[in-house]
């Protein structure tokens, strides 16, 4: 058994087939990029809603657009995604020799679509399921409607679909480790490619391709020159994004170290700083129509609150139904104007029930 384990961890180092640690590391790199950028945009939107609110509402679409530019640049230049190139890997057609330089057009487009669209669709599906689950928990939908039965069917089947999806990926990873499979991911199989290590010949070929592009750009027609300039501009945008992500990787490692157990004393000293005064626009007049005089009255419906619910972004308390519909429609707090999503609704349970 020990022989088998040693064989698994050492065979990949002697040939062009990457080890399981390399392929899993490159996948986790892009998986960590989206939550990190999402948190940064969230902080910006909460600090300045008027300027960054749109960026927060359309984050998934903007991130997908940047991801498309980034992956398109690296697939056309290095035959690999950004994370694969970061770890010295490239894509070749299944069954082809390791010396293959560029991906065929069919495999190129399949790789690009699977790299960009699958994560986007998965994030959107999870948001829809979470929203439907909240609506079901608090009986927001009409219990006799046809849509509610459809929602229940979706909520009942989603855990099994997710389990099947994860099991599909796990099977490919186990086959890659134990039986020397060609792919560690079914998405690579669907794209018709496999991963291999970059060689010195590949690096020299990339340099020559860049030199030839610069040489040919000086002896072409005006239309071709414009196309070349646009292509270089997109490449520059993708390169700047990739450089930012590379720096972000080291920044994430720094955050892991900063919030480790060894630095708890430092964090405690920082948390003991005095609380800053509230923003000026929070100091509303007592006669403001947004805030009723009685603390038990909902600011929206002007009735005694039912199912007290606070907004995590501002701290104001409303009826759950009032807060739910308002936040779902306007994506902001009705009193402070801070950007707010449904996940910021916090159900309150009083001691007297």
UniProtKB/Swiss-Prot annotation:
Residues in compartment: Cytoplasmic: 48-51, 135-139, 272-353
GO biological process entries: protein import into peroxisome matrix; protein monoubiquitination
Binding site for Zn(2+): 298, 301, 319, 322
Keyword S-adenosyl-L-methionine among UniProt keywords: no
UniProt membrane topology term: Multi-pass membrane protein
Zinc finger (RING-type): 298-337
SUPFAM superfamilies linked to this entry: RING/U-box (SSF57850)
Transmembrane segments: 20-47, 52-76, 105-134, 140-178, 244-271
Entry-linked InterPro entries: PEX12, Pex_N
Peroxisomal matrix side: 1-19, 77-104, 179-243
Location within or outside the cell: Peroxisome membrane
Pathway involvement of the protein, from the record: Protein modification; protein ubiquitination
Superkingdom assignment: Eukaryota
GO cellular component, one term: peroxisomal importomer complex
Keywords, ordered alphabetically: Membrane, Metal-binding, Peroxisome, Protein transport, Transmembrane, Transmembrane helix, Transport, Ubl conjugation pathway, Zinc, Zinc-finger
Transport in keyword set: yes
Free-text function comment from the UniProt entry: Component of a retrotranslocation channel required for peroxisome organization by mediating export of the PEX5 receptor from peroxisomes to the cytosol, thereby promoting PEX5 recycling. The retrotranslocation channel is composed of PEX2, PEX10 and PEX12; each subunit contributing transmembrane segments that coassemble into an open channel that specifically allows the passage of PEX5 through the peroxisomal membrane. PEX12 also regulates PEX5 recycling by activating the E3 ubiquitin-protein ligase activity of PEX10.
Quaternary data: Component of the PEX2-PEX10-PEX12 retrotranslocation channel.
PANTHER family, sorted: PEROXISOME ASSEMBLY PROTEIN 12, PEROXISOME ASSEMBLY PROTEIN 12 PEROXIN-12
Description of its domains: The three subunits of the retrotranslocation channel (PEX2, PEX10 and PEX12) coassemble in the membrane into a channel with an open 10 Angstrom pore. The RING-type zinc-fingers that catalyze PEX5 receptor ubiquitination are positioned above the pore on the cytosolic side of the complex. The RING-type zinc-finger is degenerated and only coordinates one zinc ions, preventing E3 ubiquitin-protein ligase activity.
Similarity field: Belongs to the pex2/pex10/pex12 family.
UniProt protein name: Peroxisome assembly protein 12-A
Organism this protein belongs to: Xenopus laevis
Gene that encodes it: pex12.S
């Amino acid at each position: 058994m020990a022989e088998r384990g040693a064989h698994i961890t050492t065979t990949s180092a002697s040939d062009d087939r990457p080890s399981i640690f390399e392929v899993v590391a490159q996948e986790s790199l892009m998986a960590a990029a989206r939550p990190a950028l999402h948190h940064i945009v969230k902080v910006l939107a909460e600090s300045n809603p008027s300027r960054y609110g749109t960026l927060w509402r359309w984050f998934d679409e903007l991130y997908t657009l940047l991801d498309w530019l980034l992956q398109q640049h690296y697939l056309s230049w290095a035959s690999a995604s950004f994370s694969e190139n970061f770890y010295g890997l490239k894509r070749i057609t299944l069954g082809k020799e390791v010396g293959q330089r560029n991906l065929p057009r069919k495999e190129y487009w399949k790789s690009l679509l699977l790299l960009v669209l699958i994560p986007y669709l998965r994030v959107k599906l999870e948001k829809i399921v979470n929203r439907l689950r909240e609506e079901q928990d608090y009986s927001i939908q009409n219990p006799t409607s046809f849509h509610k039965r459809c929602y229940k069917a979706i909520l009942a089947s989603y855990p099994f679909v997710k389990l099947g999806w994860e099991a599909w990926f796990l099977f490919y990873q186990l086959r890659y480790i134990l039986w020397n499979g060609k792919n560690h991911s079914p998405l690579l199989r669907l794209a018709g490619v496999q991963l291999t290590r970059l060689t010195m010949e590949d690096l020299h070929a990339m340099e020559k391709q860049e030199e030839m592009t610069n040489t040919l750009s000086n002896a072409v027609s005006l239309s071709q020159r414009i196309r070349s300039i646009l292509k270089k501009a997109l490449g520059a945008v993708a390169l700047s994004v990739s450089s930012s992500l590379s720096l972000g990787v080291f920044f994430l490692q720094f955050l892991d170290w900063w919030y480790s157990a060894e630095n708890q004393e430092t964090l405690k000293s920082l948390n003991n700083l005095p609380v800053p005064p509230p923003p000026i626009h929070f100091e509303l007049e007592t006669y403001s129509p947004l805030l009723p005089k009685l603390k038990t009255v909902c600011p929206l419906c002007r009735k005694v609150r039912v199912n007290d619910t606070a907004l995590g972004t501002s701290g104001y308390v409303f009826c759950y139904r009032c807060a739910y519909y308002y936040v779902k429609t306007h994506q902001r707090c009705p009193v402070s104007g801070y950007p707010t999503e449904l996940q910021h609704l916090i159900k309150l349970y009083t001691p007297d029930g």
